[in-house]
């Protein structure tokens, strides 16, 4: 009915709209309308769930925080339905509920809770009967850490697996915040993360104990409760969490223990990737966790689907979108601890996978694999994710289709998300007025030289025209908040823009440049810090990379800017990885960039590597590569320089490097 009410006035206005030449956008109206209706239904369903939990008995397991009541509900409604597949292990929703209940009770014991009834009204911090934890607990751990307070933060340093999920869910049920720590961090970065989120405890995988040994004195000095997850835990001051949980009953935990005072309260911390510095602990609210229950619903995924997830759980894409999104629809998730391109299609065939959650690099790894029989006999109908480049998109569909690719855009700490629900290749979303009515955002003009939005005489920002790159911003509101980061308030200063369209308004600054085309499709253009300026022109590193990646002998390309003495701006440099068994063809490469890129956008330097440096989530390391420069006496990789006079890429020898610095070699 809602769809008909929206469609009727548009039909009446159709003749006028055709005269105004808006048909390029109107042709996508059915898809826009269908997604809008789905989004409205999703919002209504999430609101109904939240209201039902709020009205439930505080003693019931179906009250409290959204993770607690959603899992309890699914355990009651579909107890035998498979929730998790991990290797040869299978866990039903009822088993997930019981395992997390044991973990919750182990943590509640560390809080001093003994299972009494609650004392007063909803939202109170009273917990019923609470006493100090048994005296032997702290002594056994060799720590003087006080009992965990309600709302204390417990950091997880765990690989993707069942233990990660049961501990995360158990912490939520126990009324404790969780901090997901990237598993590769050690020494200074690890201690920084623990301090920045105010962690009171750390749960670590036993397999990490050896590499963490140098950090243990500092961890003990911080007064942390220390737990490990395995029978091999025999290090002084570290207890075996799973052993403690095994001693607990698996009965449901009262919901009031996890009920937030406010839905905007911090539920957990997720650390940014740290590509430009130390990671920041993004605050994730209870509202955002609830909203993430709707992710797969918005993507058209259903309860009977089987979702393949091989992304790190310490990032939002794996935990909130993958796991919480799966809980939102009650589906099954196949959790792979580490992505393997050679095993992917065999896994999909074995587990009858229908949905695959990706980041762009995973799809590129798949298309670069040798053909296999399993890739022709699968049931995958939908791939959902972000960061898929157009050339890989086309190759992926041509080789593995028919299936749908649903590209999305979003940020861990952000308040805006986009969905390309039409399948248009290369687009990250739609900017239809229907979509922006539900998920408001704008593209504003941006000066890459000053690093600031362009403002008019009144001091307000201006929206971009079709085809013009613009900074993506979204209004901060009660429905779309920005909570910032744990620690000093100035960490979030650059993420907020004020007086954008009117005095007093506040918008979230994504730091990303997007382009909206004539048909209303959004295309990722560049990160504001990644756009380089050379010869007085702006160069989008992503566009240059996409051009080079069409060469059949290149498997991976990373474009970044380097400072050249005697020149303004930053010159483009391309780190290249070859596609085996191909060889680097400098003549073809120069011809290709000359034909497809303007002179100022052509890379001045090439660096040939066996594989390109990435973060744990496969994001390319641009800052590090830029800092390493192009000095052949420092770098062992083969280097090449563009000689403008000759019109060719030549080996960057020490002699040519000296000629470049003296100005004798023109680039």
From Swiss-Prot:
List the InterPro entries: AMP-bd_C, AMP-bd_C_sf, AMP-binding_CS, AMP-dep_synth/lig_dom, ANL_N_sf
The EC number(s) given in the record are 6.2.1.15, 6.2.1.3, 6.2.1.-
Q: What is its main location?
A: mitochondrion
Statement: the UniProt record of this protein carries the keyword Lipid metabolism: yes
In its UniProt record, which GO terms are filed under biological process? acyl-CoA metabolic process; lipid transport; long-chain fatty acid metabolic process
Q: Where in the cell is it found?
A: Mitochondrion membrane
UniProt keyword annotations, A-Z: ATP-binding, Fatty acid metabolism, Ligase, Lipid metabolism, Lipid transport, Membrane, Mitochondrion, Nucleotide-binding, Transmembrane, Transmembrane helix, Transport
Q: How does this chain sit within the bilayer?
A: Single-pass membrane protein
Query: What would be one Pfam family of this protein?
Result: AMP-binding_C
Its recorded reaction(s) are: a fatty acid(in) = a fatty acid(out); a long-chain fatty acid + ATP + CoA = a long-chain fatty acyl-CoA + AMP + diphosphate; (5Z,8Z,11Z,14Z)-eicosatetraenoate + ATP + CoA = (5Z,8Z,11Z,14Z)-eicosatetraenoyl-CoA + AMP + diphosphate; hexadecanoate + ATP + CoA = hexadecanoyl-CoA + AMP + diphosphate
Q: Where is this region: Disordered?
A: 114-144
Recorded GO CC terms? mitochondrial matrix; mitochondrial membrane; mitochondrion
Keyword DNA damage on entry: no
Q: Which PROSITE patterns match?
A: AMP_BINDING (PS00455)
Q: Which residues bind ATP?
A: 272-276, 315, 412, 512, 527, 619
Regions that span the bilayer: 3-23
Tell me the tissue specificity. Answer: Expressed at high levels in adrenal gland, testis and ovary. Expressed at lower levels in adult brain. Found in adrenal cortical cells, spermatocytes and interstitial cells of the testis, theca cells of the ovary, cerebral cortical neurons, and cerebellar Purkinje cells (at protein level).
Q: What family does this chain come from, according to its entry?
A: Belongs to the ATP-dependent AMP-binding enzyme family.
Described by its record, this protein's role is as follows:
Mainly functions as an acyl-CoA ligase catalyzing the ATP-dependent formation of fatty acyl-CoA using LCFA and very-long-chain fatty acids (VLCFA) as substrates. Can mediate the levels of long-chain fatty acids (LCFA) in the cell by facilitating their transport across membranes.
Name the PANTHER family on file. LONG-CHAIN FATTY ACID TRANSPORT PROTEIN, LONG-CHAIN FATTY ACID TRANSPORT PROTEIN 3
UniProt protein name: Long-chain fatty acid transport protein 3
Q: What species was this sequence derived from?
A: Mus musculus
């Amino acid at each position: 009915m809602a769809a008909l009410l929206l469609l009727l006035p548009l039909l009446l206005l159709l003749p006028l709209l055709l005269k105004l030449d808006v048909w390029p956008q109107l042709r996508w109206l059915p898809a826009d309308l269908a997604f809008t209706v789905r989004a409205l239904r999703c919002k209504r369903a999430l609101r109904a769930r939240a209201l039902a939990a709020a009205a439930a008995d505080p003693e019931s397991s179906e009250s409290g925080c959204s993770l607690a009541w959603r899992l309890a509900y699914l355990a009651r409604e579909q107890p035998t339905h498979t929730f998790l597949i991990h290797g040869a292990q299978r866990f039903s929703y009822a088993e997930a509920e019981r395992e997390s209940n044991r973990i919750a009770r182990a943590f509640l014991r560390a809080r001093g809770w003994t299972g009494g009834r609650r004392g007063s009204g909803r939202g109170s911090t009273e917990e019923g009967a609470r006493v100090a934890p048994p005296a032997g607990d702290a002594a056994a751990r060799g720590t003087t850490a006080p009992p965990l307070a309600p709302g204390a933060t417990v950091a997880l340093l765990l690989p993707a697996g069942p233990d990660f999920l049961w501990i995360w869910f158990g912490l939520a049920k126990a009324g404790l915040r969780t901090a997901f720590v990237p598993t590769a961090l050690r020494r200074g970065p690890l201690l920084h993360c623990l301090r920045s989120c105010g962690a009171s405890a750390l749960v670590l995988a036993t397999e990490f104990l050896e590499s963490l040994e140098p950090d243990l004195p500092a961890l003990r000095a911080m007064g942390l409760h220390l737990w490990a997850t395995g029978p091999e835990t025999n290090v002084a001051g570290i207890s075996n969490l799973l052993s403690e949980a095994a001693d607990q009953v698996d009965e449901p935990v009262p919901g009031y223990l996890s009920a937030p005072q406010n839905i905007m309260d911090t539920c957990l911390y997720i650390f940014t990737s740290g590509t430009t510095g130390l990671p920041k602990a993004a605050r994730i609210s209870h509202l955002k966790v609830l909203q993430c229950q709707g992710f797969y619903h918005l993507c058209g995924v259903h309860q009977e689907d089987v979702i393949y997830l091989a992304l790190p759980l310490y990032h939002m894409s794996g935990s909130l979108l993958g796991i919480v999104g799966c809980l939102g629809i009650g589906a099954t998730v196949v959790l792979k601890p580490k992505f393997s391109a050679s095993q992917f299609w065999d896994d999909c065939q074995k587990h009858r996978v229908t949905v695959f959650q990706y980041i762009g690099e995973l799809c590129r790894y798949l298309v670069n694999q040798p053909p296999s029989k399993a890739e022709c006999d699968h049931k995958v109908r939908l791939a959902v994710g972000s960061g898929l480049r157009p050339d890989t998109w086309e190759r992926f569909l041509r080789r593995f289709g028919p299936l749908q690719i649903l590209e999305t855009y979003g940020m861990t700490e952000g308040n805006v998300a986009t969905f390309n629900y039409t399948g248009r290749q290369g687009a990250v979303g739609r900017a239809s007025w229907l979509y922006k009515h539900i998920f408001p955002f704008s593209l504003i003009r941006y000066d890459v030289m000053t690093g600031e939005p362009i403002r008019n005489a009144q001091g307000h920002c201006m929206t971009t025209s079709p085809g013009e790159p613009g900074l993506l911003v979204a209004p901060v509101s009660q429905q779309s908040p920005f909570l910032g980061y744990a620690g000093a308030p100035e960490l979030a200063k650059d993420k907020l823009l004020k007086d954008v369209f009117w005095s007093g308004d506040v918008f979230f600054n994504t730091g990303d440049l997007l382009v909206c085309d004539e048909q209303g499709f959004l295309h990722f253009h560049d990160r504001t810090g990644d756009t380089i300026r050379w010869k007085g022109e702006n160069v989008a590193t992503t566009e240059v990379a996409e051009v080079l990646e069409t060469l059949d002998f290149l498997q991976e390309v990373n474009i970044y800017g380097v400072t050249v003495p005697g020149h303004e701006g930053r010159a483009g440099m391309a780190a290249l990885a070859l596609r085996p068994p191909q060889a680097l063809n400098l003549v073809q490469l120069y011809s290709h960039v000359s034909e497809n890129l303007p002179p100022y956008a052509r890379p001045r330097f090439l660096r040939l590597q066996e594989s390109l440096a990435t973060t744990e989530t496969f994001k390319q390391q641009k800052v590090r590569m830029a800092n390493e420069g192009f000095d052949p006496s420092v770098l062992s990789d083969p280097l090449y320089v563009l000689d403008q006079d000759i019109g060719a890429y030549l080996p960057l020898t020490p002699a040519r490097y000296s000629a470049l610095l003296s100005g004798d070699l023109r680039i």
